[in-house]
Amino acid sequence: MATQTIDDTSKTTPKETLVGTTLKPLNSEYGKVAPGWGTTPLMGFAMALFAVFLSIILEIYNSSVLLDGIPVSWG
Protein backbone atom coordinates (compact mmCIF):
# COMPACT_ATOMS: atom_id res chain seq x y z
CA MET A 1 0.00 0.00 0.00
CA ALA A 2 1.25 3.47 -0.83
CA THR A 3 2.05 5.95 1.89
CA GLN A 4 -0.60 8.53 2.58
CA THR A 5 -0.07 12.14 3.64
CA ILE A 6 -2.19 13.03 6.65
CA ASP A 7 -1.74 16.81 6.68
CA ASP A 8 -1.23 19.28 3.85
CA THR A 9 1.73 21.04 5.43
CA SER A 10 4.14 19.38 2.99
CA LYS A 11 2.31 20.89 0.03
CA THR A 12 3.54 24.44 -0.34
CA THR A 13 2.73 26.89 -3.07
CA PRO A 14 5.60 28.69 -4.81
CA LYS A 15 6.38 32.12 -3.39
CA GLU A 16 6.13 34.94 -5.90
CA THR A 17 9.21 37.14 -6.02
CA LEU A 18 10.05 40.33 -7.85
CA VAL A 19 12.63 38.52 -9.98
CA GLY A 20 10.17 35.77 -10.89
CA THR A 21 7.49 38.29 -11.84
CA THR A 22 10.00 40.23 -13.93
CA LEU A 23 11.30 37.17 -15.80
CA LYS A 24 7.93 35.46 -16.36
CA PRO A 25 7.22 37.16 -19.73
CA LEU A 26 10.50 35.78 -21.08
CA ASN A 27 9.37 32.25 -20.30
CA SER A 28 6.02 32.71 -22.05
CA GLU A 29 7.78 32.30 -25.41
CA TYR A 30 9.09 28.84 -24.44
CA GLY A 31 8.65 26.25 -27.19
CA LYS A 32 7.76 28.73 -29.92
CA VAL A 33 10.00 28.66 -32.98
CA ALA A 34 10.21 31.57 -35.38
CA PRO A 35 9.73 30.58 -39.02
CA GLY A 36 12.74 30.65 -41.30
CA TRP A 37 16.34 31.18 -40.30
CA GLY A 38 15.64 33.75 -37.57
CA THR A 39 18.84 35.06 -36.03
CA THR A 40 21.07 32.23 -37.31
CA PRO A 41 23.14 34.52 -39.60
CA LEU A 42 23.75 36.89 -36.69
CA MET A 43 24.96 34.00 -34.54
CA GLY A 44 27.23 32.82 -37.36
CA PHE A 45 28.73 36.29 -37.63
CA ALA A 46 29.30 36.43 -33.86
CA MET A 47 30.98 33.00 -33.95
CA ALA A 48 33.25 34.12 -36.79
CA LEU A 49 34.29 37.24 -34.87
CA PHE A 50 34.99 35.12 -31.80
CA ALA A 51 37.15 32.75 -33.88
CA VAL A 52 39.15 35.73 -35.19
CA PHE A 53 39.56 37.00 -31.63
CA LEU A 54 40.83 33.61 -30.44
CA SER A 55 43.29 33.34 -33.33
CA ILE A 56 44.67 36.82 -32.55
CA ILE A 57 45.12 35.87 -28.89
CA LEU A 58 46.87 32.65 -29.93
CA GLU A 59 49.20 34.52 -32.30
CA ILE A 60 50.12 36.98 -29.55
CA TYR A 61 50.76 34.11 -27.12
CA ASN A 62 52.97 32.30 -29.65
CA SER A 63 54.76 35.60 -30.44
CA SER A 64 53.70 35.29 -34.06
CA VAL A 65 52.52 38.88 -33.86
CA LEU A 66 55.10 41.29 -32.49
CA LEU A 67 53.73 44.27 -30.64
CA ASP A 68 56.05 47.25 -30.99
CA GLY A 69 56.87 48.93 -27.70
CA ILE A 70 55.16 46.32 -25.52
CA PRO A 71 57.56 43.92 -23.81
CA VAL A 72 56.19 40.37 -23.68
CA SER A 73 57.91 37.96 -21.32
CA TRP A 74 56.30 34.63 -20.36
CA GLY A 75 59.01 33.32 -18.12
UniProtKB/Swiss-Prot annotation:
| Membrane topology summary | Single-pass membrane protein
Q: Where in the cell is it found?
A: Plastid, Chloroplast thylakoid membrane
Where do transmembrane segments lie in this chain? Answer: 41-61
PTM summary from the entry reads: Phosphorylation is a light-dependent reaction catalyzed by a membrane-bound kinase; phosphorylation occurs on Thr residue(s) in the N-terminus of the protein.
Q: Which GO terms describe its biological process?
A: photosynthesis; protein stabilization
Keyword tags: Chloroplast, Membrane, Phosphoprotein, Photosynthesis, Photosystem II, Plastid, Thylakoid, Transmembrane, Transmembrane helix
- SUPFAM superfamilies linked: Photosystem II 10 kDa phosphoprotein PsbH (SSF161025)
Annotated GO CC locations: chloroplast thylakoid membrane; photosystem II
Q: Which Gene3D superfamilies match?
A: Photosystem II reaction center protein H
Residues that the record marks as modified (Phosphothreonine) are: 3, 5
Q: Which GO terms describe its molecular function?
A: phosphate ion binding
Q: Which PANTHER family does the protein's record reference?
A: PHOTOSYSTEM II REACTION CENTER PROTEIN H
The entry assigns this protein to a family as follows: Belongs to the PsbH family.
Q: How does it assemble?
A: PSII is composed of 1 copy each of membrane proteins PsbA, PsbB, PsbC, PsbD, PsbE, PsbF, PsbH, PsbI, PsbJ, PsbK, PsbL, PsbM, PsbT, PsbX, PsbY, PsbZ, Psb30/Ycf12, at least 3 peripheral proteins of the oxygen-evolving complex and a large number of cofactors. It forms dimeric complexes.
What is known about what this protein does? One of the components of the core complex of photosystem II (PSII), required for its stability and/or assembly. PSII is a light-driven water:plastoquinone oxidoreductase that uses light energy to abstract electrons from H(2)O, generating O(2) and a proton gradient subsequently used for ATP formation. It consists of a core antenna complex that captures photons, and an electron transfer chain that converts photonic excitation into a charge separation.
- Protein's name in the database: Photosystem II reaction center protein H
